[in-house]
């Protein structure tokens, strides 16, 4: 089963400019490490011109800590297609950088252990939130001279129960199979503006990014404390428009089970820094969890 790119040429370049862009993002990349302390990371999934640098901070940290055997990538289902909790079946994903294999053995085991996940490719066909993560992984795997696999999982339902089920299923499946895994939670934070139906406050252009950051940091503080329930409580209280809390919650649950004891915010920004528009502003964060 082959999954072809759906957003190459829109969210990220479809030609040689992609490599040039990744080289700029990773211009400060160090040597690949072998500590393997990182259990999971959070990375945004907007167009690379807006959030690519922030996402690169997550992958830089993982590379310098040591690449895993498999990345389990969780992203929100924006299209509404397919199974509510969809693990991509065995197969291959293609991007402008080439092919990357789905870890079919791990995908099947996660779906078997989980009480809610199905093997389903339809949910992934047009979804961008996972696709935009893949070129970062391919680029760094090439740098390291390693073959790295992925397990893409889309979430159409996002709550504490989903996070608990999936986080535990990923941990138990990887332990059962002896797989070295890093979980990636693909999410953007606040989506501010009439286009998103979310204008919880008004502010001058020079104040708006700071106000958005304040609201996002109420959630980020909970994430850094490994507090899944508190994160969802903050989201509900603010009616916050973070799009991938289920994946973040899953990453936290998995990380706790995998022995993580600390989390670090590596980078935060908003789309305003590029667009200079206050009509639609989105927050982006890079976070890693470590043993």
From Swiss-Prot:
Signal peptide (UniProt feature, chain positions): none
UniProt-listed Pfam families: Memo
Domain of life: Archaea
Record SUPFAM superfamilies: LigB-like (SSF53213)
Gene3D superfamilies linked to this entry: LigB-like
Protein family per UniProt: Belongs to the MEMO1 family.
NCBIfam families, sorted: AmmeMemoSam_B (TIGR04336), PRK00782.1 (NF001987)
Protein name (record): MEMO1 family protein TK1477
Native species: Thermococcus kodakarensis (strain ATCC BAA-918 / JCM 12380 / KOD1)
Taxonomic path: Archaea, Methanobacteriati, Methanobacteriota, Thermococci, Thermococcales
């Amino acid at each position: 089963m082959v999954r072809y790119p759906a957003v190459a040429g829109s969210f990220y370049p479809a030609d040689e400019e992609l490599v040039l862009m990744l080289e700029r993002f990773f211009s400060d990349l160090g040597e690949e490490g072998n500590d393997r302390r990182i259990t999971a990371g959070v990375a945004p999934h907007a167009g690379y011109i807006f959030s690519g640098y922030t996402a690169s901070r997550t992958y830089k940290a993982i590379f310098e800590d040591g690449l895993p055997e498999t990345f389990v990538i969780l992203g929100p289902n924006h299209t509404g297609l397919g199974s509510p909790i969809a693990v991509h079946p065995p197969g291959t994903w293609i991007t402008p950088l080439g092919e990357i294999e789905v870890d079919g053995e791990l995908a099947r085991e996660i779906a078997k252990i989980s009480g809610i996940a199905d093997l389903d490719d339809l949910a992934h066909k047009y979804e961008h939130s996972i696709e935009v993560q893949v070129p970062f992984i391919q680029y760094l795997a090439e740098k390291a001279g390693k073959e790295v696999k992925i397990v893409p999982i889309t979430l159409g339902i996002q709550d504490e129960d989903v996070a608990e089920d999936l986080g535990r299923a990923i941990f138990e499946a990887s332990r059962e199979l002896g797989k070295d895994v890093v979980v990636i939670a693909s999410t953007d934070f606040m989506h501010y503006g009439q286009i998103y139906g979310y204008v919880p406050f008004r502010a001058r252009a020079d104040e708006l990014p700071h106000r958005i950051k304040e609201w996002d940091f109420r959630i980020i503080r909970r994430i850094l404390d490994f507090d899944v329930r508190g994160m969802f409580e903050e989201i509900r209280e603010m009616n916050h428009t973070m799009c991938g809390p289920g994946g973040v919650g899953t990453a936290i649950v998995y990380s706790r089970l995998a022995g993580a004891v600390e989390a670090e915010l590596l980078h935060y920004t908003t789309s305003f820094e590029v667009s200079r528009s206050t009509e639609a502003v989105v927050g982006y964060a890079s976070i890693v969890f470590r043993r």
